[in-house]
Amino acid sequence: ADTDMALAVARARGTGATAIKIYANLDGQTVHRIIEEAHRQDFPVWAHGMLFPGLPADIVAAGPEVISHVCYLGYQLPPRPANYHERTGVDVSLFEAGIPTEITTLFDQMHESGIVLDATARIYAPGPGGDAPGSWRCEGDLAFRLINEAWRRGVMISAGTDGDTAWDHPYPALHEELELLTDRAGLPPMEAIRAATAVAARAVNQEDQMGTIEPGKLANLVFVHDDPLADVSNLRSVAFTVRRGVAYQREDYVPVTEEEMAEIGS
């Protein structure tokens, strides 16, 4: 409460940061003060969907540019953890009859305010990038049901991964995220592609530079052999990529070796 918010935001801008990230333990009033001042200084804000004890409704009402981690929005319904370091699973029994009005109202408000949902589907899926069953996030298909509901209500979905694949994996975690958005969350392939391009550019406040193909934007492109609109996993059939107008052939890609990784780790 004693923080000089104008000075704090100005200092963040002065570091060269591109946005303010809000997470962990903050009350709703403080969240509102941070976002209000950041916007006064024309500085974007990314926030977790729950800021303990700040509720999802508090976060949405405060109006950040991006809200991250779809399952945090489930904490709008009690019971909920007391703080960030004591997170427990969302009570899936509350969603057995459908998505409650308290949650759909949040999605409607996000749509009306133009708030992007950085859904991070990958961390909710069993496997190397996700959590074990029964952990503190979402069990079963709840995360994917929430993503689908948000998308159907017009919320912009961004393809954030909140993690990476193993060092020896031939493609980054983004591909897993896109496949989960289509295969589990039910988004059409084109919507998943938009989540990784146009919406992602908006999420990081770079839509004037990238995200769509049009004059004046950076020539950052990927060319694939197979049709990703038929199956988004076809994005793995990379022929070549273009970064700032320079082409890089996939056939020239040299995977990192275990020895190189060991050297980096040391």
Question: What residue ranges belong to the model's regions?
Answer:
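Conserved, mostly hydrophobic/aromatic
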Residues: G16, A38, M110, L117, ...
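Catalytic domains of carbohydrate-active enzymes, especially glycoside hydrolases
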Residues: R11-A19
